[in-house]
Amino acid sequence: RASAASDVYKRQGHYKSFAGWYISQECSRNTGKIVDLYASLGRYCKEVSGGLPTMISPYIDGSKNVSQYNASTSKQNVVTLESHEREWDAIFAGIKGAVDIVAFQDGHVEYDELVDFLKVNKKLADRYGLECWTNSETFDRDMPIKFLPIKWEKLRLKMGLAAQAGYQNAITFEFSHFMSPQSAYLQAGHLYDRYMEYLKTLE
């Protein structure tokens, strides 16, 4: 409920770390009343907080958009690049001014398709004045075990494709399980080490 946002801001809004809002409803297509939901909730969050930025993190209805309860790792009925562009053009037109940042999840399409979707997403976001970030998933959708930490080379590839498409900001899902040294997955700590080594090469 929207009123919950007002209650949260009254209790927590004075903290310096309260820098904005994440609207947690995820979608991949222009279905139902998703535009109305994003627009109304985004405007309400900004209204009660003095204009703090709002973010959404949708996904792409690609071949890897498979339920975690399904042993399969891919599907056949997927969105085309053209349909994706058309539907998200309409969504962005409807949420302009209510949503400030869009961070598409990067794990639902094949690696050789990803850069094209990244470029389309950024082109549309630029058109409507939204910031376009990438949400780089740190778990592996290519394995029948749902889910294990992603191999470093795959994560590095996705980050490189985002940079190639002109992205400057990234978030991840999900650090605590798949990348934290404190995770129960031993691979997560190794992924963290590889990432920190990579950051040192940028200094």
Model regions and ranges:
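Alpha-helix N-cap and loop-to-helix initiation/capping positions
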Residues: 1, 32-37, 76-87, 112-113, ...
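Aromatic-lined carbohydrate-recognition surfaces of secreted/lumenal glycan-active proteins
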Residues: 1, 22-26, 41-84, 101-107, ...
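Short, small-residue-biased leader/transition segments that mark boundaries at the very start
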Residues: 2-9
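Alpha-helical scaffolding segments of alpha/beta enzyme cores, especially the outer helices
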Residues: 7, 36-47, 90, 116-123, ...
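A short acidic (Asp/Glu
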Residues: 32-35, 66-69, 114-115, 144-147, ...
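Substrate-binding cleft of secreted/luminal carbohydrate-active enzymes
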Residues: 103-111, 131-203
